[in-house]
Amino acid sequence: MNKKFWLSLLTVVMVTSLLAACGGGKENNSAGGTSAAGNEGGKEDKVTFTYFNAAAGKDKNTNETTIGKIFEEQTGVNFKMEHLVGDENTKVGTFIASNDYPDVIVPGSSIDKLVGAGSFIPLNDLIDQYGPNIKRVYEPYFNLMKADDGNIYFLPLSAVTGEYTSAPNIEQGAFWVQRRVLKEAGYPKIKTFDEYLTLIREYVKKYPDEGLTGYLSLTTEDKFFAFTNAPMHLAGYPNDGGIIIDMETHQANDYADDDITKRYLQELNQLNAEGLFDKSSFVDNYDQYLAKLSSGKVLGFFDYRWQAGQAMNNLREASNKSGNDDLEYMALPIVYDENTKDQYLDPPSFVNNRGVGISVSAKDPERIVKFFDNLLTDENQILSNWGIKDETYSVDENGRFYRTEEQITQTNTDAFRESFGFKYFEYNWPRYGNGSTLPDGNSVGAGRQPEVAQMSYSEGDKKLLEAYDIASFSQLFSAPDERPWYPAWSIPIDQGSPSQIFTQKKSDLQRKYFPKLVLASPSDFEGVWNEYIGEFNKLDVKQYEELITDEVAKKIANVKGQ
């Protein structure tokens, strides 16, 4: 298939777009915003604030990156960025106990704990006074952002502006398999979990002396959901967290004790008995997990692309040098049963329990809000996502953004992404959410631009796409059904409440029993499962399910403006 054919197909796939749910894509939040010079005249003195991101990463000053230096020139503001080492709850607990915080915090699952402890300042008045761009981007979502007391304590990361554009490639969860496995089998159409595991078993059987790992799991404390979420996806549901929402009744069901969870664990138990499951999955840290994926020895795994991205980028760099993409992975929409519709792709959504907050320790919150506001111009969102014209992206005669092969190779290199600042500024700051478009029709995210997707495909990519008769990798997956509440995991749960205590006890129970269930001899599996269920039944799951059901109903009403 020639380049023109690919581009036309991808353009049809991606230009046909939906207005984002939850008020996304409304005209009132699609204008370009106040100029990047800011909304006040005159330059202020330079200042450095502290910034903590509850995710792994390399500590750095923002002005040590190309993008961050430009932002410092615009605003006089630099941030000393610190990233998480160890356990998030332990780190956040230290902040709370000392009442001494970084100026800016980007929490993960601890965000409810920080809000409950009064760690963040209210932003309402600051937005009114210093945040015209913040208001333009976020105002359609204000009813979803306010706490029970009416205050806004953090700015979420998923406010869609303009029309919603779906991703051509898989950005979220999937069952991944090495390309050489598909090639060896003649590029079969794989849908069920049984077919997926059979594919892996047959490849290992054919190459027994290569030291291959059939299946690997990510189970670190802060990423354990990558292990527990798999049964939900196999049953045909999207990532609502540890809960399934019925499409008709909107009733919530915790599936931790359901057959779909038992079936997944039992399949892994059998893989382990055959020597195909990596036992170290339950003790490896995140870096060790990424190293194993990068090694080329792991045939299959379930995870979210954004968690395994560093390893996948490493593999792409290696294949670019060698010209052989056998060790790269392809995402598959695997489900348990042939007649189940997969739902891996996220519907348009607004995640209102993740974001960026200003702490009570911040000495100059007005200056920080001005910096945030300055980020939210079209000009600076282009800088954060595309970079600098004629250096990291180009523009054709019709005003369409694209990247040359050289620019794509450069901007996909991990070291360059770090030094330029893409790695820091594409996410974890106030931003136009994934799927946003600019007023001129260009995608905010370079990866969702049809021209970039087409040019990014290697010869190996194109061979795979042709083999499966698709124009982009996401076409292998079913379109997402509308879910106004999505994602349910964004529903805030009060610290110390019965529901929060339940989720913590459930998590502790899963961490204790799931390794046992996978590593037990197959003859002992039923006994260990029954022991686990006995302990699970002591927990108050009913009140948790009732809470989520009620909150889902409220979110649906808010989204629909009822």
Which residues does each PLM region occupy?
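Carboxylate/His-rich catalytic cores and anion/metal-binding grooves
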Residues: S119-K146, I200-Y203, G211-H250, G300-N320, ...
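Sec-dependent signal peptide hydrophobic core
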Residues: F5-M14, R367
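Helix-loop-helix "hinge/cap" segment bordering the ligand-binding cleft or interdomain interface
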Residues: N151, P156-F225, D246-F301, V356-N398
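Paired acidic/hydrophobic, glycine-rich loop segments that form the ligand-binding mouth/hinge
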Residues: P102-V106, L299-Y304
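Conserved small-residue motifs centered on glycine
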Residues: L383-P515
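C-terminal motif of bacterial Sec signal peptides marking the signal peptidase cleavage site
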Residues: S17-A21
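Conserved N-terminal structural module of periplasmic/extracytoplasmic solute-binding proteins
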Residues: N2-S8, G23-E195, Y207, P238-I244, ...
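Extracytoplasmic/periplasmic substrate-binding proteins
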Residues: A55-T62, T161, N169-W176, K183-K189, ...
